[in-house]
Each structure stands twice: as structure tokens, then as C-alpha cells.
């Protein structure tokens, strides 16, 4: 981020189009190739046939020839390797894709926005809220939570919709023209864009850039949904008796008479409280309501029309299924390399009146998030942070890095896990995962300095150095959309998903 700020200070007049020149900066491809903003990667200009080394000159030629008429010679699909040019096409395409990911994430990072003078100070969520929910869903208690709508986010998505959606948030026309060319050349990389089979946004074959595009697309979908939800209270109907003179409401009125024949003369109370609770996980999302299924049916058609009209994505009614939420239901989520287990608990509250001595029992349904300690330990064991029993071990492959980089990597993973699971009411499992990562970090540092853990702790003030493992973070590095000039856009642009959870490294590819 320091390199980006220095670049902007050199030429402040080009801040609107600063993304395009970054495409030709050497350190961008070094950062993208290393997948770590804290790692110093050298630019290698020899052995271009190797899959582990690359030439910056060839990367620049690829970008330049994308504008030329003969660029199809560079991206021919007849073989994996272009014998005429002598380099691996897919390898350099991967580098360009990762570089685009690094560049396009810059204007959406919290650190970059806070560095601008006119940036708006945005407070982070409190300690009792987790990051996988836009609205209060997991952490709140509801007296009546009866119906759940399981929504499958539609795909494939047209490439032009992706480019226009990303261009609307960051005004850098030259960069997005280059991005459009790149997407059309490599649209067959990702099943999310071209094929209609089950989406797998976190597959190892998917580049980091397409993960960003997918989350950005879902983010746009959720931001519009958030806008509709905020304004739905102005559209609610307190009584249908005021609508008798309107002809186009007769059909709805007749339908309601059939369903609610006995209560037709009364005010329909479920229109007064359009409470919708939302959470997204993997390629799906959930809408939950404590009202009758009629409200979810209305939102069902809202979303279908939204996808068809705004995103040009054809969606059928089967993509949204409404079902009744029972007490034995349990939800299992897997997103971003993390697993959540949400159970619906039924509790009874007993109260007693003072004057009249009789008990009153009120049943309440409560959703609690649970930290899945066993799957997390398996994930840590797979990433070589501990053994299968959960005993911390050192990370030998990281001993070549500096002490600061080693600690930063462990802290980043620990921070992301904390962001995801700290909404749970029971944090004992979360503290155990933090302990494993903390001790694994100490063992890795001791192994690097060829010392024992006890001797290393005596020589170094570990309490001051590693205190972040045990403290809750007050500020969250999140993805914030800048406020648009339009009043309409400012109504629904909110903090709705987090960028830092994508960089969980070894835990990211958990299966």
C-alpha cells in the first residue's frame, strides 16, 4: 500500500485514472506472483520456459498486443504452449490475472480509502457481530422465525455486466477497457462466467481475480437488495380497504380473500413488519422471515425481476425455494475456507404475574453460531500448523522469511478466523484455534533461530510481541465502497462484505 500512496503523491492529478498506469509497473507483477503484499519478489528475466519464473518484458508485450489486431496469435487455444513465442500461455495469463486482481482491489481497500483526504470515516462492527451477515441474523433472537427462503445466486454472468459493474464503482476508463479485452480473451477460464454447472468460487483452479469478480457481482446484487429492503417499508400496505378503487389490485384482493377469508376485514398485520434477515454463504443465500410466506413470495419475484432486468441473467422460480423453519433444522455453511454450523434452538421463558399466581410460558427460537473446532483443526493440520490431534507444530517452509513476515502471516490468518467466528456466543473453540496458531508461530520462530521454545521465549519478550493473538481487534480491514455522488446510489452503498477474508493463505484451499 505504501507504493500505491507514493505513486499517487507523485501525480495527484491522475487519481481518477491511476489504475491503468499501475498495469505496467514491475512491482505489481512481483506482488501478484508472490500472492503476498509483504513479500519481496525479484523480477526474473531469464529462463522464460520455466513455469516458476517469468519475464516482465513478455508480460508487457502481452498487454500491449492485446490492443493489436494480431493478438489472437498470442492467445491461440490450439496448444498449452505457444512454440513460436516460446512461453507458457496459461502461466503468463495467470500472472496477468493476478496482477489485475492486485490492481482492482486497491480502490476498494479500507487502507487506501482512509488515506484519501475526502474519505469518510467508517466505524467497524462491534465485537458481537460476525462478518458473513448483512443484516442481523445469526446473532439475534426472534420470538417467531417461521420461514426460510433458500436462494441460489444465478449464473453465468455476462462479461459486459461485470465490467460495467466494476467500472461504476471506480472511475478508471482506460484500465477497464484493458480489463474488458482480457476478460473476453480468457472467458473460458472460469465456470462461473461461461458454464451453467454448479458454481465453485473457491476452487483451486479459479484465479484470485475471478474470486474478486464473483464477490463483486454478489456485492452489487446485495447492495441493490439492501436498498429495496430499506425502502420496502414505504411500500407496505396497512389495509386493503383503501385500494378498492384501484382495478389492478382486484386480482391480488381476490387471492387474499381465498387465503385469508376469515381475517379479510381485519388489517393484515404481516404487511406492517417487513422484517427480512439475510445471509450469504458459498453460492447461495438465505432469506428468513418471522411473517407468513406471502412476504417471502413477494421478495422471490422481486429478486427474479432484479436478476433479469438489471443483470440480464435468466432465472427461474426454482432458484428460490421457500420452506418452513422447524426446530430441528441446522444450517452448515462453507465459505472462504471457513465452516459455520448454525443450529436452531428452542427455549422456553417462564414468567409469573405478581397479582395472579399462574405461570406463563413463552417459546422462543434462537439461532446460535457454533465454532466447528474439529473441521478447523483438520484444516490447520492440513496446512501443517498442528497435527491431527491439535498439537501445534512449526512451519518449516516459512523459516526463510523475516521474523516480521512470519508473525504477520500468523496474525493475518488468526485475524481472519476471528472476524468470521467472533459472532458466536461460545468462543472457547475460537480461543483454542488462536492458541494453536500462537504456539505454532513461536515454534516457527524458535526453529528459525535454532533454539528451543523455552529459550526463545526467555530471550524475547513474547508477551509484547504476540499479544495480538489474544486481543480482539477494534478495527477491521474491510472492503468499503466509496460514496457515490448520486443520491440514489448513496442510499444503498453500505459495508456489506469483507475483502481480507480472501487472503487466508493455507486455510483458503480447505476442502
UniProtKB/Swiss-Prot annotation:
Keywords: Chloroplast, mRNA processing, Plastid, RNA-binding, tRNA processing. Coiled coil: none annotated. InterPro entries: Domain_X, Maturase_MatK, Maturase_MatK_N. One of its GO terms (cellular component) is chloroplast. One of its GO terms (molecular function) is RNA binding. It is found in: Plastid, Chloroplast. GO terms for biological process: mRNA processing; RNA splicing; tRNA processing. It holds the Pfam family MatK_N. The keyword Transmembrane does not apply. The keyword Chloroplast applies. Belongs to the intron maturase 2 family. MatK subfamily. Usually encoded in the trnK tRNA gene intron. Probably assists in splicing its own and other chloroplast group II introns. PANTHER family: MATURASE K. This is Maturase K. It comes from Adesmia lanata.
